[in-house]
Design a protein with these regions (language model features):
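Alpha-helix capping and helix-loop boundary segments enriched in small/acidic/polar residues
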Residues: 7-14, 39, 65-73, 96, ...
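Hydrophobic helix-and-loop "lid/oligomerization" segment in the mid-to-C-terminal part
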Residues: 1-6, 25-27, 45, 53, ...
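Acidic, glycine-enriched active-site microenvironments
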Residues: 26-27, 32, 40, 70-76, ...
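A short, charged helix-loop
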Residues: 38, 52-66, 77-86
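N-terminal small/polar loop signature for handling phosphorylated ligands or for N-terminal nucleophile
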Residues: 1-50, 58
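Amphipathic alpha-helical transducer elements in NTP-driven molecular machines
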Residues: 17, 72-75, 79, 119-122, ...
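Short, well-ordered alpha-helical packing segments
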Residues: 20-24, 79-82, 126
Length: 195
């Protein structure tokens, strides 16, 4: 009986007040990682940000924090949490750095500035993507007949839209299944469905 005890959001949750409250009432811990604007209330001279009642809310746009770069995408915010956990728990950095491919895709597709940390995420992610071992990504590119170098265009106009196509299909879970699947036949079946 593996019970879920923690929910970590990625790129959402900053306005999910009711949903976070329900999860907390059900006994779950909730960490919100998001980059979207935070709701504010203005009581006189001071503006106050209104946050969901999660165990932690990680958002570079929080005014009570002094994180130097506020234009991270949702995937990058979640990646930063993972990096902190990997450091604390002595995690496998090769695995963590392998996720830069997804952070690069998220950075381009979330249409944030390609400056500061975002620029580094995209450069490093593209280096890895051009030699990727991720079968789901390879299958999408193959099914899209993409045979050139993977660049920002590939992220923004081939990979990103293909992954987002799941919203138009019966279930958005198809993209996640594609990225996690290990059976090569199933991977290509899912890629064909998306492309």
């Amino acid at each position: 009986d593996d019970k879920v005890s923690l929910i970590i959001t990625c790129d959402n949750g900053i306005t999910g007040f009711d949903q976070v409250k329900e999860l907390k009432a059900a006994g779950l811990n909730v960490i919100v990682t998001d980059h979207h604007e935070i709701e504010t209330s203005n009581n006189g001279e001071w503006a106050k940000q209104i946050l969901p009642e999660a165990n932690a809310v990680i958002n570079p746009k929080r005014i009570d924090q002094d994180y130097p770069f506020t234009d991270l995408c949702g995937a990058a915010v979640c990646f930063k949490l993972m990096a902190a956990l990997f450091k604390k728990l002595d995690g496998d950095y090769d695995y963590l750095y392998g996720l830069l491919e997804y952070v690069a895709m998220g950075t381009v597709c979330d249409i944030v500035s390609l400056t500061d940390e975002n620029r580094i995420f995209v450069i490093e992610g593209l280096k890895r993507l051009n030699y990727t071992e991720k079968l789901g990504i390879k299958a999408i590119l193959e099914e899209s007949s993409w045979q050139k170098e993977i660049d920002v265009y590939t992220l923004g106009f081939i990979l990103g839209p293909t992954m987002n196509a799941t919203g138009r299909l019966s279930s958005a879970k198809i993209a996640i299944e594609l990225l996690m699947e290990e059976n090569i036949d199933r991977i290509y079946e899912l890629a064909k469905e998306l492309v």
